[in-house]
């Protein structure tokens, strides 16, 4: 029988995902066959598995930390907010329904069956399962509808460790309140972790001792505030979308990613901000756009709405002017669609509007269909075939025009085709994750170095190795600051 451990939190963004990631790596390093699991995830940050299924990005990163291939059972239910249209429900990697928040709860029975099916699958395949909760388990108005927190813990009789975020303040009250509101599950709570602490741990000692007495649970560690982990945080979009110019003021190549209202998969650009000769920021301010060498329109969960926003702010005009002046404009997925001439939506997949003018910088039109394309891809840059790329597609539209920027194979569909288009200094593609390609990243940056009279740099760091080092560093920090032997004892290891 597989061993179990569940990490829950007193709130969203308290550090559950990163702690699970660290524990997966620590366990892997002990030679244990471990896997992550999160029954239900709400996020616009998703990942496509080898078989074309869509799961939360956090579970894909946790699987990487565990040394296993991500699959749809690690996150059987993925919720993707779609604004006024409601919530897209992705079940076992495929779009199931789009519902409003009220109707969503009527699906509990069906979704719970999917959750337990996935649990049973993973328990057979692995020796240890580290389970992540969602938000707070103490949302007492939703307890009867729960399929992700105490419902999972009770179903498995899994020991639960509760994480509290001291950086927000009120950590003792939130830990105490969570346990006391869930007294019927008291036997499942085995201890707590205080996360994001700034200062000397001795200051906390009186409070920790008092809380241990009040709830009769031990403190298993105090984790310091980590300014930079290098690991994408699904809840951290507001924290991530900050101005990085100040951090590398002398870097020659300035990149601005448009800070869209419905931005998705912002992790696409993480590799760019670690390059030594780039400055990366997210902005919609005209003064920032005017100083940029490269402007990227990212993916969007609501392409029409974000395109309307750009029009209201007259950013579409600014982009056209900058393109004439030689600034490189790039569109990824929804951003690619926006750069075209028209977006046509006969089935009203994206909007009540059936047709919308694009920015007009690429000679393409996009037609939206209800079916979603989800697949991993691999290929090369057509103009320089030695530049290899990998990534994934996740979109509903099909874009028509003289495509030929990349030659790709959709691996889960066994289909070879051309993707993307380039028109002067403007280009677009459907492929997420292309900047994880070390050679493509350096190709992009070097062209701007040469333009500025600088020599190109032959070397580019390995993003794959850097990610591994980020996970190792996180794991070392967590292991150092937890009573890890007691954690393993709780898990029965």
UniProtKB/Swiss-Prot annotation:
Gene3D superfamilies: 3.40.50.880, P-loop containing nucleotide triphosphate hydrolases (3.40.50.300)
Gene Ontology terms for molecular function: ABC-type vitamin B12 transporter activity; catalytic activity
GO biological process, any: cobalamin biosynthetic process
Keywords: Cobalamin biosynthesis, Glutamine amidotransferase
Pfam families (UniProt xref): CbiA, GATase_3
Pathway where it operates: Cofactor biosynthesis; adenosylcobalamin biosynthesis
Residues of the GATase cobBQ-type domain: 252-440
PROSITE patterns reported in the protein's UniProt record: GATASE_COBBQ
Origin superkingdom: Bacteria
Active site residues according to the UniProt entry: 333, 432
Keyword Transmembrane found: no
CDD domains in the cross-refs: CobQ_N, GATase1_CobQ
Entry's family note: Belongs to the CobB/CobQ family. CobQ subfamily.
Job of this protein: Catalyzes amidations at positions B, D, E, and G on adenosylcobyrinic A,C-diamide. NH(2) groups are provided by glutamine, and one molecule of ATP is hydrogenolyzed for each amidation.
Name this polypeptide is given: Cobyric acid synthase
Origin species: Thermodesulfovibrio yellowstonii (strain ATCC 51303 / DSM 11347 / YP87)
